[in-house]
Amino acid sequence: MSATPEEDKKPDQGAHINLKVKGQDGNEVFFRIKRSTQLKKLMNAYCDRQSVDFNSIAFLFDGRRLRAEQTPDELEMEDGDEIDAMLHQTGGGAKNGLKLFCF
C-alpha cells in the first residue's frame, strides 16, 4: 500500500516557514511566519529590531528584490531560506559634470 501525498509531506512543510534575514554587517535575524503571510510583516519586524527606516532597506531573495506584498508561497521559498537586507545605495553620478554615454 502506498502513502498518500499528504503522508509524504515532511512535518515541517506545514503552514509555517523559518526564514533568515542577513544584514550587510553579517547580523542574522530569524523569523517564523506563515507561508501565506505577506513579507511586509517580516520586513517591518526586521526594520523595527534593527532600528532602521523601512524605506532605507532593500530585501533580496536569490538576487531579486522582494516586494512587500509577496508571500513565501509565491516565491516558492523553502524552510531555512535566506533573505538579504541591503541598505539603499544613493548617488553614483559622474564627477565634474562628466557624462557617460553607452552605444
Curated annotation (Swiss-Prot):
Residues 15-92 form the Ubiquitin-like domain. CDD domains: Ubl_Smt3_like (cd16116). Coiled coil: none annotated. Its main location: nucleus. GO terms for cellular component: cytoplasm; nucleus. The keyword Kinase does not apply. The keyword Nucleotide-binding does not apply. Disruption phenotype: No visible phenotype. It is found in: Nucleus; Cytoplasm. Keywords: Cytoplasm, Isopeptide bond, Nucleus, Ubl conjugation pathway. Ubiquitin-like protein which can be covalently attached to target lysines as a monomer. Does not seem to be involved in protein degradation and may function as an antagonist of ubiquitin in the degradation process. Required for the massive protein sumoylation in the nucleus induced by heat shock and controlled by SIZ1. Interacts with SAE2, SCE1, SIZ1 and MMS21. Interacts with HSFA2. Covalently attached to ABI5, FLD, GTE3, HSFA2 and ICE1. This is Small ubiquitin-related modifier 2. It comes from Arabidopsis thaliana (Mouse-ear cress). The lineage of its organism: Eukaryota, Viridiplantae, Streptophyta, Embryophyta, Tracheophyta.
